[in-house]
Design a protein with these regions (language model features):
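Charge-dense, helix-prone N-terminal extensions
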Residues: 1-148
Length: 148
C-alpha cells in the first residue's frame, strides 16, 4: 500500500527506486543457514555463528536467508548485515555500512554502501563496539524502511 507521501512524490516524478537490498524470500529461520553453520565447524565458523546470533537477536522482525553463499540478516525483507567465513578471517558486513556511525572505527572497505569488520582468529575485536555497530545497522534499516 502506497503512503500519501509516496503518492505525492510519485505524482511529482521525484520518487526514487529503493536502494535497499530486498529479499522477499527471507524467513524467520532458514534451514540453509543452519547447514552453512554446520559446514563451518572450525574456529572461524564459531566466530561467524556468534556474530550472526547477535544479528538474529536484534528484534522480532529479523529475517534471514543465504545470499551469495553467506548468512544474511534482514529487517523484514531488507538486508542489514551478514557474516562470511574465509580462509583466515570472518567478515561481519553491513549493507549500508558507509552510512552508519562507527565511533570506534571498526569498519573497513571503500564501496559506495557496504562496509565490513574483519575478524581473525588471532586478533582481538571489541565485542561491545561490534555489538553496538550491529544494533545501529539494525535500527538504521528500520528507519529506512519506515521512510519508504
Amino acid at each position: 500500500m502506497m503512503t500519501e507521501r509516496r503518492a505525492k512524490l510519485k505524482a511529482k516524478g521525484t520518487l526514487r527506486a529503493s536502494q535497499l537490498m530486498r529479499f522477499p524470500t527471507a524467513v524467520k529461520r532458514d534451514a540453509a543457514i543452519e547447514i552453512w553453520m554446520h559446514d563451518h565447524p572450525d574456529e572461524l565458523g564459531a566466530i561467524a555463528r556468534r556474530w550472526f546470533e547477535v544479528m538474529r537477536n536484534c528484534g522480532d522482525d529479523v529475517r534471514e536467508l543465504l545470499h551469495d553463499g553467506h548468512p544474511t540478516a534482514c529487517v523484514a525483507d531488507a538486508a542489514f548485515a551478514y557474516v562470511n567465513a574465509f580462509t583466515a578471517h570472518v567478515n561481519v558486513g553491513f549493507f549500508r555500512g558507509a552510512e552508519i556511525a562507527d565511533p570506534d572505527r571498526l569498519l573497513e572497505g571503500t564501496g559506495k554502501f557496504m562496509r565490513h569488520v574483519k575478524i581473525r582468529c588471532d586478533s582481538h575485536v571489541d565485542a561491545a563496539a561490534l555489538t553496538k555497530l550491529i544494533e545501529v545497522a539494525y535500527i538504521d534499516m528500520k528507519r529506512r524502511l519506515k521512510a519508504e
